[in-house]
């Protein structure tokens, strides 16, 4: 009898053990003095299994195919204390994925594909002590990343892609404040692992390096020999060996700002920029899309770089102003270099090409503002000429009251031009003419850049309030209004009145069309915005008909860099 009872007990225990160890396919469950656990190693799992027991205290799913932690995936496992998800393919953590895990003390996510972490998710885990994120792809830490991790004793961010960290990340850490103020003496050390990251040791990392140098117990670095990866002059050096200076805005200079060279000669424009961190240099010139010039960059010293723009075989069209701009995160600076071309006879040259035919002397050029940005505007123009494949244009641009304006020569087939880096509250004039002709009525736009605009307006537009067109505009972007110089009344007063009427209409009908069009401008002209003689109307009507015939022609464009 006793043997039968013993046999049944053994069978029962085996069944219970089998059921317990095979709780999920490919996984095993167990119970020890710490509670019940689930272990899944090298399985084909692509997601967290459904129906997890509520009394689990430890979950370990490693070397599987998890790619995401969905919202509230562990919310019903409220007893969970240890969560190991190492060596999976996790790239996304939902901001609410840790919901309900108030008892979680350990989270390990080593060897995944995380580029960022939703740090506010840790508001759900106030008792977290261990956070292991090593061997991921994290490349940035926001200043308040550690705000909801007041009880950490181990933070591992080693072997990620961190290059720059603000010292405020740790200065804003509640644990750092409490330890420094001795509010709660720590029962254990706080271990930080930050090694094996591609640290960029320029002025932006200065505060963090000083913080690392000042660390004292209970804060301990797992590896105190943090190493610079860049820039080249500091690569391989330890943090304690580098002394970083404060960041400064670029200062640009040029040894020569006026260059005159013969037609066909080679010209090299040079500018230097001193900045911390190192500035990025770019050249702005009108014909960038037409001709590819070579830009040679070299380092003068740790803070200074030099750029050389090589113009091979100087053409007449290369004559003009070249701007060297250097910028870093603090701002930008520029210098303008003037290039003139001498003809074989010794006089200044202008774009070559056949002389304007008598019929082209009075060609009507339709010019309009096509785009506006925070930094400038883009204009477009149309003109019907006898030989469009050989027709050159001249852009005249500068402040409205400037005696001499910059001239930029545009080759055949180009019908757009952009200007950037405009000053606020400044009146500018831009004209488009044939070859070297002087601007005439209908070929210019005068515009005033805005000032005192709020942040939303700054994102939407820079140029606003008024655009003065010397003859006629076919389309005007939102926020711009047109007047003509031959109006019989005060143009600015009329534009201001139109602006008030438009704002009133927009407030009354917020879903209405906000884009100014030729139709709306034409209606305004009928009310007296401008008047024309019958002769001018007939001439423009003929030009408009020609333009309409070529409306669908392909027009390559060149953008200002």
UniProtKB/Swiss-Prot annotation:
Domain Ig-like: residue ranges: 250-342
Matching SMART domains: IG, IGc2, LRR_BAC, LRR_TYP, LRRCT
Chain residue ranges for the region called Disordered: 507-561
Disulfides per UniProt: 271-324
LRRNT domain ranges (all copies): 22-54
CDD domains: FN3, Ig
Residues in LRRCT domain copies: 197-249
Mode of membrane association: Single-pass type I membrane protein
Chain intervals with Basic and acidic residues compositional bias: 528-547
Entry coiled-coil feature ranges: none
LRR repeat ranges per the UniProt record: 55-76, 79-102, 103-124, 127-150, 151-172
Entry keywords, A to Z: Disulfide bond, Immunoglobulin domain, Leucine-rich repeat, Membrane, Repeat, Signal, Transmembrane, Transmembrane helix
Signal peptide, first to last residue: 1-21
The protein's name: Leucine-rich repeat, immunoglobulin-like domain and transmembrane domain-containing protein 2
Lineage: Eukaryota, Metazoa, Chordata, Craniata, Vertebrata
Gene name of the encoded protein: lrit2
């Amino acid at each position: 009898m006793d043997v039968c009872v013993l046999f049944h007990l053994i069978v029962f225990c085996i069944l219970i053990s089998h059921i317990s160890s095979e709780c999920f396919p490919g996984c095993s469950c167990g119970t020890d003095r710490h509670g019940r656990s689930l272990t899944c190693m090298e399985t084909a799992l692509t997601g967290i299994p459904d129906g997890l027991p509520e009394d689990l205290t430890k979950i370990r799913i490693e070397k599987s195919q998890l790619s995401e932690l969905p919202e509230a995936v562990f919310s019903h496992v409220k007893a969970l204390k240890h969560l190991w998800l190492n060596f999976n393919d996790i790239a996304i953590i939902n901001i609410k994925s840790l919901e309900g895990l108030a008892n979680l003390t350990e989270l390990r996510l080593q060897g995944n594909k995380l580029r960022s972490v939703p740090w506010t998710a840790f508001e759900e885990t106030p008792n977290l002590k261990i956070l292991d994120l090593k061997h991921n792809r994290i490349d940035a830490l926001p200043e308040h990343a550690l705000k909801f991790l007041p009880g950490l004793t181990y933070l591992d961010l080693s072997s990620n892609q961190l290059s720059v960290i603000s010292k405020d990340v740790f200065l804003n850490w509640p644990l750092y404040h409490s330890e420094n103020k001795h509010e709660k003496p720590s029962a254990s050390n706080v271990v930080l692992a930050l090694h094996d990251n591609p640290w960029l040791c320029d002025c932006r990392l200065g505060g963090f390096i000083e913080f690392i140098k000042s660390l004292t117990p209970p804060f301990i670095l797992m590896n105190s020999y943090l190493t610079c990866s860049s820039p080249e002059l500091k690569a391989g050096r330890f943090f304690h060996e580098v002394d970083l200076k404060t960041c400064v805005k670029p200062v640009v200079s040029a040894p020569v700002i006026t260059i005159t060279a013969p037609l066909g000669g080679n010209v090299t424009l040079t500018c230097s920029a001193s900045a911390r961190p190192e500035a990025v240099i770019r050249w702005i010139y009108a014909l960038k899309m037409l001709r590819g010039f070579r830009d040679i960059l070299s380092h003068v010293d740790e803070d200074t770089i030099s750029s050389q723009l090589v113009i091979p075989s100087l053409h007449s069209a290369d004559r003009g102003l070249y701007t060297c701009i250097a910028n870093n995160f603090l701002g930008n600076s520029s210098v303008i270099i003037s290039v003139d071309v001498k003809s074989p006879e010794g006089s200044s040259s202008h774009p070559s090409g056949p002389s304007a035919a008598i019929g082209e002397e009075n060609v009507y050029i339709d010019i309009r503002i096509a785009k506006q940005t925070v930094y400038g505007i883009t204009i477009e123009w149309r003109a019907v000429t006898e030989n469009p494949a050989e027709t050159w244009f001249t852009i005249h641009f500068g402040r409205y009251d400037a005696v001499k304006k910059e001239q930029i020569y545009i080759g055949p087939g180009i019908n757009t031009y952009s200007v950037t880096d405009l000053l606020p509250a400044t009146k500018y004039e831009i004209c488009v003419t044939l070859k070297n002709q002087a601007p005439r009525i209908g070929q210019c736009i005068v515009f005033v850049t805005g000032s005192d605009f709020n942040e939303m307006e700054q994102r939407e537009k820079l140029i606003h309030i008024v655009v003065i067109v010397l003859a006629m505009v076919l389309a005007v972007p939102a926020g711009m209004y047109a007047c003509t110089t031959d109006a019989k009344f005060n143009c600015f007063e009329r534009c201001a009145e139109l602006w008030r009427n438009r704002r009133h209409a927009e407030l009354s009908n917020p879903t209405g069309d906000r884009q100014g069009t030729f139709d709306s401008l034409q209606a305004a002209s009928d009310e007296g915005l401008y008047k024309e003689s019958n002769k001018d109307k007939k001439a423009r009507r003929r030009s408009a008909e020609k333009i309409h015939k070529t409306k669908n022609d392909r027009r390559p464009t060149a953008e200002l860099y």
